[in-house]
C-alpha cells in the first residue's frame, strides 16, 4: 500500500506572477529530493474504547447471533466465526432490506477472491432472521457461511452505531416514517449528496457496472459503454445500480425486512482486525454512509504491523 512510485515531476514553487526575466521561471525540482530526505512519522488514529472490547462484545451477544448457513446460534463457537488469528474484515450490515447492506455486499463479493488469496477472512453480521439472511445471500451472492444475523440491536448499541433519526424524541415514531425522513436527508448526514452524486457520476471514480462484476446490470452497462464510454463512473451509473437493488428489495420485502420496524433505520459499520486487535473502524453516519469498499480493502491489505506509525510524506505522494 505504501510503495514509492515516481521519481521526479515538474513542480512550480513560485506563487508570484512570473516574468521573462525571472531566473526561477519554469524550473523543476525532483520530488524524491524531498521525500528521500524527510520522513514524518504520523501516529494512527487510536481506536474507540468500545472497539478495543470487540471480542468481549461479540462473545456477550454470541447467543443472539445465528449463522445463516445452518441457523445455529454462535454460542461458544464465536471464535470460529470471527477468527482470533490473522487479518479479518468484519462488516456490520444494516437490516437486510436496506440499500446499504445490498450495495456493500455486492461490492465485497467482487473482492472476496482477492481477500482469500491474501489470507484475509471476511465475516458479516446483519439485522434480520435466518430466512432473511438466506434470501439476502441468494440475491446478492454473499456467501451464507460468512454471514450471521440477529434480530436485536443490542450489539450495534454496544459498538455505538447510530440508531437512526428520532431515537431521542419523546414520541416513538413508526420505523417507516423515520426511514422516509432519513431518505430525505433528515437526521442522515451525507445521504442527499451521495444520492445526487449517483446521478452525476465522476471522472475520478471507477465504474461499477462492469462485465463480470457482481453489481453489473448488463443491459444498461452495454448502452452506457456505447454512448458514454468506459473506465469512469458514468452519469446515472450508481443511480441505476440503486434502482435495480431497490426493485429487488421491494419485490422481496416481506422475506427480507425485520419484524421490529425500529431496525429499519439502525446504522452499521465495519472493522478490520489484525490478530484480534481492531485497527480500522468505520461508523455509518447515515443512509448510504457505508464504508467505501476500496478504502476497506486498502486497510485490510496493509503490510506489517498496522499499529505502527506511517510515513506521512510517502502517503502524501501516493
Q: Where in the sequence are the language-model features?
A:
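Thiol/selenol-based redox catalytic cores and closely related redox-interacting motifs
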Residues: 150-286
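N-terminal chloroplast transit peptides
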Residues: 1-28, 32-40
Amino acid at each position: 500500500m505504501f510503495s514509492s512510485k515516481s521519481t521526479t515531476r515538474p513542480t512550480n514553487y513560485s506563487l508570484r506572477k512570473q516574468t521573462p526575466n525571472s531566473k526561477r521561471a519554469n524550473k523543476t525540482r525532483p520530488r524524491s529530493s524531498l521525500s528521500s530526505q524527510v520522513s514524518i512519522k504520523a501516529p494512527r488514529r487510536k481506536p474507540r474504547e468500545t472497539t478495543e472490547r470487540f471480542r468481549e462484545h461479540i462473545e456477550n451477544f454470541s447467543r443472539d447471533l445465528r449463522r445463516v448457513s445452518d441457523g445455529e446460534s454462535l454460542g461458544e463457537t464465536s471464535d470460529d466465526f470471527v477468527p482470533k488469528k490473522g487479518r479479518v474484515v468484519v462488516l456490520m450490515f444494516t437490516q437486510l432490506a436496506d440499500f446499504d447492506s445490498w450495495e456493500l455486499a455486492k461490492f465485497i463479493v467482487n473482492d472476496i477472491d482477492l481477500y482469500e488469496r491474501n489470507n484475509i477472512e471476511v465475516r458479516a453480521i446483519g439485522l434480520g432472521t435466518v430466512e432473511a439472511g438466506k434470501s439476502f445471500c441468494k440475491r446478492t451472492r454473499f456467501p451464507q457461511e460468512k454471514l450471521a444475523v440477529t434480530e436485536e440491536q443490542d450489539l450495534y448499541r454496544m459498538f455505538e452505531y447510530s440508531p437512526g433519526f428520532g431515537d431521542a424524541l419523546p414520541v416513538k415514531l413508526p420505523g417507516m416514517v423515520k426511514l422516509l425522513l432519513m431518505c430525505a436527508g433528515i437526521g442522515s448526514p451525507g445521504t442527499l449528496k451521495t444520492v445526487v452524486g449517483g446521478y452525476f457520476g465522476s471522472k475520478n471514480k471507477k465504474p461499477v457496472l462492469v462485465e463480470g462484476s457482481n453489481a453489473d446490470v448488463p443491459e444498461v452497462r452495454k448502452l452506457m459503454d456505447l454512448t458514454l464510454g468506459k473506465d469512469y463512473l458514468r452519469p446515472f451509473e450508481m443511480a441505476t445500480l440503486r434502482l435495480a437493488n431497490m426493485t429487488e428489495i421491494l419485490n422481496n420485502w416481506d422475506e427480507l425486512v425485520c419484524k421490529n420496524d425500529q431496525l429499519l433505520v439502525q446504522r452499521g459499520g465495519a472493522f478490520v482486525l489484525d490478530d484480534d486487535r481492531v485497527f480500522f473502524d468505520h461508523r455509518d453516519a447515515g443512509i448510504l454512509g457505508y464504508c467505501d469498499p476500496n478504502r476497506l480493502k486498502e486497510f485490510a491489505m496493509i503490510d506489517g504491523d498496522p499499529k505502527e506509525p506511517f510515513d506521512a510524506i510517502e502517503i502524501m505522494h501516493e
